[in-house]
Amino acid sequence: KNIYNYIPKFTNHFGIEKTLSEKIDLEKAPKEVESEPIPKKDDDKLYTDDIVFRFYSKSANAPPGEGKGEIIPEEKKKDFEELGKISNWRKVLSNFAKTPFKLGKDEFGNEYEWQSVEHYYHANKFTNNKKFFESFTLNSRNSNEEMSKNPVLAKSYGGKSGKVKGKKILERKGIKTDTDFFGENGRQGKVMEEGHRAKYQQNKDAKKILLLTKNAKLQHIVRASKDVIFYDTMRIRKELQ
């Protein structure tokens, strides 16, 4: 029996169980994708338009090509049978998946550990404030330790509103986003791709899932908006193939 048939272990490994410790109404959680990957030259060669997989952090566990809005030719379904055997594979593609990785170091040379890409992304908005930046890491040993383990809380702490359930987060008071993070020449795209690359390079199960998507077009579902094409993730898939 391998890890892909042992669903409870696999589920806990990626932290996709529904019993989260925080008391946030997940249905009212903010939009999951804040930075849309910008396509580069030849990115259209990373995928085929006749196979489209759509996902987000609460995706239904449907066979490849049978999720809402997905596309797959009938004759190609057999190419994704192995992927379909993995429970909740779509959720693993989300930034919210708990796929711990190491990336970056502090001034003493200690590696930063991150619970998810979501944590890494939001932390890097606040490199101007070391204490708040480090509160997003698993190295954190302060009052934000719960947040450092929970992607939904990380989104709330690092989001534009800086609120949890309508209440201002005290730790955000007076802390502003780095001026070089957003904008035409901002770091946001680079940071997101760095996080994705570390996630898939350091997590063998996440890597396996990504590779099993083969040449499918990967689109992240965003609440009340159009899908976001995950060009960066597909670039990494190409690197790993």
Residue ranges of model-derived segments:
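Charged, low-complexity intrinsically disordered segments
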Residues: 10, 15-26, 30-241
